[in-house]
A protein has these predicted regions:
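M16 family metallopeptidases and their MPP-like homologs
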Residues: 50, 55-68, 77-79, 95-188, ...
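Bacterial N-terminal signal peptides
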Residues: 9-18
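Proteolytic maturation boundary segments
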Residues: 21-49, 276-317, 322-323, 328, ...
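Positively charged n-region of N-terminal signal peptides that target proteins for export
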Residues: 1-5
C-alpha cells in the first residue's frame, strides 16, 4: 500500500462520580483488531487507547491538529518553531525563578517585534545585540533542557516531536509505572508553557532551514505542490518557512497561534502499551481536566483548486543525481472512500515487487529507478511518481515511460488478480505493523488529524476487499488525467535560489547544570511501583538444534500473529568476495527454466511473501517472510532461483551500465560521500580496495562469475533462524522440506574488518560543494573487548554524548547553536578481535567549522561535571533496563551477537547491577582513562574554500583525498 496503513479507534466516556473505583464508558468498534477504547473529556480532549502487554512500556503521542498550513502568511514556519519551543519548559520547570525571569522574557518579546520592523542592517545588528544581552541575563535564571532531564528521569526514550502540513505531534515512550509522572509533566507543558531560549533555538531552526535548501527531492516536491495547490497552503507555504520570515520571527504571533490551536478540543492523546485504560483515563482527567477549551478555534478556509487542463513543467537544480517527479492532485483523507481506492491504485502501479511499473520499468531495466506513492493529506492528496534515468537516457524519456504506465491504469491494462494480491499484502502489512506500539498509536494520530470516525479506519480492510477493477480504472481516469499533472525536472546544477541564512552573533547561554527546579525534584523523589528487569534466558526463550550437515537451527515461536521469518546466514560477505553485491542484484533480474523473472515477482506477491538476498561486509543473509501457510512455497521459489537461475547477457550488460551510473550518482550525494569518508577513516584504504570492485573489474564479470559465486556460497555451512507460529518440530520439518543443504557443507572462515588504529593526529579533507560541512572525529588505540567495561561505557555515553540531556547536545546546540546535529560515543567492538573506538560527529554550516571543532575538542578533553546531570543519566539507564524486553526475532539476533563476543548471557544484567553503585567520580575516571588526550583522524567533507585551513592544519598533517580515494572507484 502506498501510504502507511493506519487504524484508529475512539473512546468517549463519562466519569462515574460514585465509588472509589472510577468506571468509564468507552466508544469501541466491533471487529477492531486493536480493541481500541476512546474517551473524550468534558473539555474535548480525546484519548485513544490500545493495550499491548508485550513490554512494560507505553508509546505516547500527543497530537495537535495544527501544522504549517495554519501558519500566518507573514510568519510561515511558525508551527514548526513552536514545536521546538515546547521543549523549553513552563512556569514550574526550565527555570529557577520564573518571577525574576518573566520581565526579561517580556522585554525580549517586545524587542523581537521591534526587530521585525527594522530594515537597516546596522540597526538590526545593534538591536539583536541588545536581544542577545538580555537573553544571556535571562539564561542565568533558566535551566536549559530540564524537560529532557524529566523525561530521562522517568525512563522515557525516543523523546521527540515533528511538524507537518496538518499536524504537530509530541512523542515519548515511557515505562508503565511512570504514567502519573508523565501526565503531570505533559499537562504542565501544554497548559502552562513558557517561551524561553528563543534566539538560540532560532539558530537551530536556521541550521535546519539551511540544510533543507540542499534537499533536492524537497525542492522538486515543493515545485509540484506550487502547481497542484496554487490556492492552498500545501503549495503556498513550507513547514520550515521562508528565509525572510525566519529572519523576522514574532513571539507574539507564536503565542497567539498556541492559544488558538493548543487547546484540549484540538488535541488527542494516543497510546499503546501495557496499562489499564480505566486508571489511565483517571490520570488524564486529574491532570488535563483543568485545561480550558477554545470553542472558537480559527481553522483554515480555502478556495477550491482550479482544474489543471494541461501539463505544467518546472525545473529545479541541485547537486544530487537527476530525476523527474510527476504529480496529480487527488482526494484527501477526509474523502475516505476515494482516498482508499487511491491506495489500491498506487499499489497496482508500484508495490516494490509486482506492480505495473515494477515489472514494465524496473524489472525490464527501462529506467534506472522508480517509485510512486499516493500521498494523502486531510485536505488533498497527490499521486506522485519519481523516475531516475539510465546512463544516456534523458529525463524526458523517463517522463514518457512513466506516463505510459499511468495510461495503463486508465485503460485497465492489468490483471484483476493484482488487486486481490494487493489486498492480501495490505493485510500482512497491517498485521506486521500492529506488532509495534509506535505504529498502533500512530494509527490513532492519523485518524484524529483527518477527522475520521474510528469505525471507518478500524474496518478499512472490509471495504478494501470489495474494491473492483472498474473502481480502479474509474479513479485513474478521474484523477490521473493525461494532461492534468505537474512535473519537476531535477537537474544537476547550482541552485540560483539558495541564499544561506547568515547566523547572527550570539553569546553562549549559561547551561546551569548545577541548578534544578523544585518541580524536577518532586518528580525525582516520587515513588513508583518498581518494575523488575527481565533479562533473556537463551536456554528457555529459544531453542537450538542442528539440521543435516551440522547446520545450526535457531528457533523462536511467534506468539503474536501468523507471520513467519526464515533467515539463513552465511559468514561470507563483500570483504571476502566483492562480487556478491552485484551478483545478488543480477539474480533479482533473472528467471528459472520454469518461471520468468516477472513471474517470480508475481508469484511471491500473490503469496503475500517477500524475500531478500543481500551481502554485507562480513555476512550474506537470505530472508523469506510472510504468512506461515505460504512460507514453504515462497522458500521453494527462492531456492529454485538461487540454484537454477537462467543467465541473460543482455540483462547483465544493462546491469553493469546501471552499476557504473549508480557509482557516479553516489559521488553527487552528500550523504553517500560522507558514508564513504567514514569507511575510509574507520578501516583505511586497504579495506576499501579489498572490498570494492573497480569499474574495470565490474565490466569484466561474466554470468558464470556471479551466479557461480552465489551457488558456491549456498553450498557452504551456515545458520538458519526461524521465527513463526509453528511448534519447533513442525518448523524444523518445514525448513528441511524447503531448504536445500549440501552434503557435508564446508565451513566458512569468519573474516571481519578491523578498525584501524590511530598512531598520530591526521586530517583528511574530501571536497563537496555545499554550504554545510560533515565532520567525523575518530580514535582507536587497540583496546580489545572486555565485558567488564560495559557499565563504564554505558554510563559515559549516556552522560556525555547521547540524547538531548547529554553534555554534547547542551553545549553544542543548546548553549552555542554551533551544530544542528552533533554526537559522540565510545563504541564497543562487535567481535573479540576488533577494538574500542571513539567517534564524534558534527553537521553544521561552513562558517561555524572552527568554533564547532574547538568547542567539541574542549568538552571531549575537559568534560564538564555535574552531579545533577549524572543522577539524571543514571536514573535513565536504570529505568530503561528495568523495562527493556528482548522479544521475537530479537532473541535470536541477540544470542548471535553475544556468541560472536564469546558470551552466553545478556550483558544488560551486569550493567544494571553495576550502574546502581556508580558515581560521577567513576565517570570522570573513565573519561580520564578512555577519552582524554586521544589521537585522532579528523575527516572533513565540504567546500574547502570556505574553511579556515590554517586552523585545520593545527589539528594535524593534512591529506587531501579525492572522492575516488574514499569510494574506491
Amino acid at each position: 500500500m502506498m501510504r502507511k496503513f493506519i487504524l484508529v479507534a475512539t473512546f468517549a466516556a463519562a466519569l462515574l462520580l460514585s465509588g472509589s473505583c472510577a468506571k468509564y464508558k468507552y466508544e469501541t468498534v466491533k471487529g477492531d483488531p486493536l480493541k481500541t477504547k476512546i474517551y473524550t473529556l468534558d473539555n474535548g480532549l480525546k484519548v485513544y487507547m490500545t493495550v499491548n502487554k508485550e513490554t512494560p512500556r507505553l508509546q505516547t503521542y500527543i497530537a495537535v491538529r495544527v501544522g504549517s498550513k495554519d501558519d500566518p502568511h507573514e510568519t510561515t514556519g511558525l508551527s514548526h518553531y513552536l514545536e521546538h519551543l515546547m521543549f523549553k519548559g513552563t512556569e514550574s520547570f526550565g527555570t529557577s525563578d520564573y518571577e525574576a525571569e518573566k520581565p526579561m522574557l517580556d522585554q525580549i518579546r517586545s524587542l523581537f517585534e521591534e526587530y521585525r520592523t527594522k530594515t537597516d542592517p546596522q540597526e538590526r545588528i545593534a538591536l539583536y545585540h541588545v536581544i542577545d544581552s538580555i537573553s544571556y541575563e535571562a539564561s542565568k535564571i533558566a535551566i536549559p533542557n530540564e524537560y529532557d532531564k524529566l523525561m530521562s528521569i522517568i525512563g522515557s526514550t525516543g523523546s521527540n516531536a515533528f511538524t507537518s502540513n496538518d499536524m504537530t505531534v509530541y512523542q515519548e515512550d515511557i515505562p508503565s509505572n511512570q504514567i502519573e509522572n508523565w501526565a503531570k509533566i505533559q499537562a504542565d507543558r501544554f497548559i502552562h508553557p513558557v517561551i524561553r531560549g528563543f534566539h538560540t533555538e532560532l539558530e537551530a531552526v536556521y541550521e535546519e532551514k539551511n540544510m533543507s535548501l540542499t534537499e533536492d527531492d524537497s525542492k522538486a516536491m515543493e515545485a509540484i505542490d506550487s502547481v497542484l495547490f496554487s490556492r492552498h497552503p500545501y503549495g503556498i507555504q513550507t513547514t520550515i518557512g521562508t528565509q525572510e520570515h525566519l529572519k523576522n520571527p514574532s513571539i507574539i504571533n507564536i503565542e497567539n497561534h498556541r492559544s488558538n490551536f493548543y487547546v484540549p478540543n484540538n488535541v488527542a492523546i494516543c497510546v499503546s502499551g501495557d496499562f489499564d485504560p480505566d486508571s489511565f483515563v483517571q490520570t488524564i482527567e486529574k491532570y488535563f481536566g483543568e485545561w480550558e477549551p477554545n470553542p472558537g478555534i480559527k481553522t483554515l478556509t480555502y478556495e477550491p483548486e482550479p482544474q489543471i487542463t494541461k501539463p505544467v513543467e518546472k525545473t529545479v537544480y541541485g547537486l544530487d543525481a537527476e530525476f523527474v517527479m510527476i504529480g496529480w492532485r487527488t482526494p484527501g483523507d477526509r474523502d475516505i472512500l476515494r482516498s482508499e481506492v487511491g491506495e489500491i491504485v498506487g499499489s497496482v502501479l508500484y508495490n516494490g515487487a509486482a506492480g505495473l511499473a515494477d515489472l514494465d520499468l524496473v524489472q525490464a531495466q527501462k529506467i534506472g529507478g522508480f517509485y510512486a506513492m499516493n500521498y494523502s493529506r486531510p485536505d488533498y492528496g497527490e499521486f506522485l511518481l519519481v523516475g531516475y534515468p539510465r546512463e544516456g537516457q534523458t529525463l524526458e524519456e523517463v517522463r514518457d515511460l512513466m506516463l505510459e504506465e499511468v495510461g495503463r491504469l486508465r485503460t485497465g491494462d492489468f490483471d484483476e488478480d493484482l488487486i486481490k494480491s494487493t489486498i492480501n499484502n495490505i493485510k500482512l502489512s497491517q498485521m506486521a505493523q500492529f506488532e509495534s506500539n509506535g505504529r498502533r498509536a500512530m494509527a490513532f494520530v492519523n485518524s484524529f488529524i483527518s477527522g475520521h470516525n474510528w469505525k471507518d479506519d478500524a474496518l478499512q480492510l472490509n471495504r478494501l476487499e470489495k474494491v473492483t477493477k472498474t473502481q480502479v480504472t474509474d479513479w485513474a481516469n478521474e484523477y490521473l488525467g493525461a494532461n492534468s499533472y505537474a512535473l519537476a525536472y531535477k537537474r544537476i546544477g547550482e541552485d540560483p535560489n539558495i541564499d544561506k541564512i547568515a547566523a547572527p552573533a550570539i553569546t553562549p547561554i549559561e547551561t546551569n547544570r548545577h541548578m534544578q527546579s523544585d518541580f524536577l525534584t518532586s518528580i525525582q523523589n516520587s515513588e513508583v511501583s518498581p518494575i523488575e528487569p527481565v533479562f533473556p534466558d537463551f536456554t528457555k526463550d529459544m531453542a537450538r538444534d542442528e539440521l543435516t550437515g551440522g547446520v545450526e537451527f535457531l528457533y523462536k515461536k511467534n506468539e503474536i500473529n501468523d507471520i513467519t521469518s526464515y533467515v539463513a546466514i552465511f559468514d561470507k560477505g563483500t570483504q571476502n568476495d566483492p562480487r556478491l553485491d552485484l551478483a545478488f542484484s543480477y539474480l533479482s533480474y533473472l528467471g528459472t527454466p520454469t518461471r520468468s523473472a516477472g513471474q517470480i515477482k508475481k508469484d511471491m506477491y500473490s503469496l503475500a511473501c517477500s524475500y531478500s538476498l543481500s551481502a554485507g561486509p562480513i555476512q550474506t543473509v537470505a530472508r523469506v517472510r510472510g504468512l506461515e501457510e505460504n512460507i514453504g512455497a515462497a522458500m521453494d521459489i527462492v531456492e529454485d532461483l538461487v540454484f537454477n537461475a537462467v543467465p541473460d547477457t543482455v540483462v547483465l550488460s544493462a546491469l553493469k551500465a546501471d552499476a557504473l551510473k549508480e557509482r557516479a550518482d553516489n559521488k553527487l550525494s552528500q550523504g553517500a560521500c560522507f558514508s564513504a569518508l567514514q569507511d575510509y577513516v574507520f578501516y583505511g584504504p586497504e579495506f576499501i580496495a579489498k572490498s570494492t570492485l573497480s569499474n574495470e573489474q565490474i565490466l569484466s564479470l561474466t554470468s558464470e562469475d556471479l551466479l557461480g559465486a552465489i551457488k558456491d556460497l549456498f553450498t557452504k555451512k551456515h545458520e538458519v533462524l526461524y521465527y513463526g507460529p509453528s511448534e519447533e518440530v513442525a518448523a524444523r520439518k518445514m525448513v528441511m522440506d524447503h531448504h536445500k543443504i549440501a552434503d557435508n557443507p564446508e565451513p566458512l572462515v569468519k573474516e571481519r574488518p578491523i578498525h584501524r588504529q590511530v598512531s598520530g593526529n591526521e586530517v583528511l579533507l574530501v571536497p563537496y560543494d555545499a554550504n554545510q560541512f560533515y565532520y567525523v572525529q575518530y580514535s582507536d588505540r587497540g583496546e580489545k573487548f572486555d565485558v567488564s567495561n560495559d557499565p563504564g561505557v554505558t554510563m559515559y555515553n549516556n552522560y556525555f554524548g547521547s540524547g538531548m540531556n547529554a553534555i554534547v547536545f547542551q553545549e553544542m546546540r543548546e548553549a552555542r547553536g554551533l551544530a544542528y546535529s552533533a554526537r559522540a560515543s565510545l563504541n564497543t567492538p562487535s567481535y573479540p578481535e576488533d577494538d574500542y573506538m571513539f567517534y564524534a560527529f558534527i553537521a553544521s554550516q561552513n562558517d561555524k567549522l572552527k568554533d564547532a571543532v574547538v568547542e567539541f575538542d574542549r568538552i571531549i578533553n575537559q568534560m564538564p561535571e555535574s552531579e545533577k546531570a549524572f543522577q539524571v543519566a543514571k536514573a535513565s539507564i536504570l529505568s530503561q533496563l528495568r523495562t527493556k524486553r528482548v522479544t521475537g526475532m530479537g532473541v535470536l539476533n541477540q544470542y548471535l551477537s553475544l556468541r560472536d563476543l564469546g558470551l552466553s548471557e545478556s550483558r544488560d544484567k551486569a550493567v544494571f547491577e553495576a550502574v546502581q553503585n556508580m558515581t560521577l567520580a567513576d565517570v570522570k575516571a573513565f573519561q580520564e582513562k578512555w577519552i582524554k588526550n586521544r589521537e585522532y583522524i579528523y575527516g572533513f567533507l565540504g567546500r574547502e574554500s570556505d574553511f579556515d585551513t590554517e586552523f585545520i592544519s593545527t589539528l594535524g598533517p593534512v591529506k587531501h583525498l579525492t572522492l575516488e580515494d574514499v569510494f574506491g572507484y
